[in-house]
């Protein structure tokens, strides 16, 4: 079966002198792998589009037995030269790519994650986002995948949580409780500023995040609590210089 679809290339590599393997995020099928036979020399079929940090329109098929995908041709949609020429920006984008490669995405959420990734690349290309930017991306991916706590009200009594008092985040249940309803046995106490920040990330996109400047304590608390949240619900944890499935 042949498909024509828009993708973002995550990673490429050689497996023969002129042939490449390509890992990409499809807007409809999630993370995919395919072979581009003659990809390193065929300008007619793949001219300038088989590089990471590229948005590409691919025509794909399969081999005769249907055991693997074959890229038949591609055309560049957007190349992100600003990312490729800046090591810091490249690192921010690569961090987001590594998370996408490691996370198991729900099929129904592929389009939302694809749109989120392309918007994230646009922002990194055009602006100079904070080093914390990939965390916002990871949190938003988790929310788009359905792991979407309500950071605004207590799950027990329904009381709004946006006072100055700390709240309790039950990571396993994906719920927040006010201090009055917390039984003291489950959950992690977080500041109201952290709860407001995570609620804001839920409701906004990458173009809004570039203006966010967080105090150091809220930054660290957001990182700590969302790292554990994604480890529990998505099975992915940051370790060393990459992500590990658990």
UniProtKB/Swiss-Prot annotation:
Keywords of the record: DNA damage, DNA recombination, DNA repair
Alphabetical list of Gene3D superfamilies matching this protein: Nucleic acid-binding proteins, Recombination protein O, C-terminal domain, Recombination protein O, zinc-binding domain
GO CC annotation terms, alphabetical: bacterial nucleoid
Biological-process GO terms, alphabetical: DNA recombination; double-strand break repair
InterPro entries per record: ARFGAP/RecO, DNA_rep/recomb_RecO_N, NA-bd_OB-fold, RecO, RecO_C
Protein's job: Involved in DNA repair and RecF pathway recombination.
Family in the record: Belongs to the RecO family.
Protein known as: DNA repair protein RecO
């Amino acid at each position: 079966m042949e498909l024509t679809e828009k993708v973002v290339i995550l990673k490429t590599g050689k497996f023969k002198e002129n042939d490449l393997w390509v890992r990409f995020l499809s807007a409809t099928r999630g993370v995919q792998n395919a072979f581009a036979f003659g990809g390193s020399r065929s300008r007619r079929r793949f001219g300038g589009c088989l590089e990471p940090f590229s948005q590409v329109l691919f025509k794909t098929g399969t081999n005769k037995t249907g055991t693997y995908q074959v890229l038949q041709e591609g055309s560049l949609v957007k190349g992100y030269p600003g990312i490729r020429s800046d090591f810091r920006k490249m690192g921010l984008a690569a961090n987001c790519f590594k998370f996408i490669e490691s996370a198991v995405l729900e099929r129904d959420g592929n389009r939302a994650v694809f749109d989120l990734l392309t918007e994230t690349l646009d922002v990194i290309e055009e602006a100079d986002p904070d080093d914390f930017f990939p965390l916002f991306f990871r949190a938003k991916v988790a929310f788009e995948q359905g792991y979407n706590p309500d950071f605004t009200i207590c799950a027990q009594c329904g009381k709004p949580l946006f006072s100055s008092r700390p709240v309790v985040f039950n990571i396993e249940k994906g719920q927040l409780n006010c201090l009055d309803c917390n039984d003291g046995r489950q959950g992690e106490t977080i500041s109201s500023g952290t709860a407001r920040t995570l609620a804001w990330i839920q409701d906004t996109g990458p173009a809004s995040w570039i203006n966010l400047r967080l105090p150091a304590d809220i930054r660290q608390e957001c990182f700590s609590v969302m790292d554990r949240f994604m480890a529990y619900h998505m099975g992915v944890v940051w370790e060393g210089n990459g992500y590990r499935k658990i």
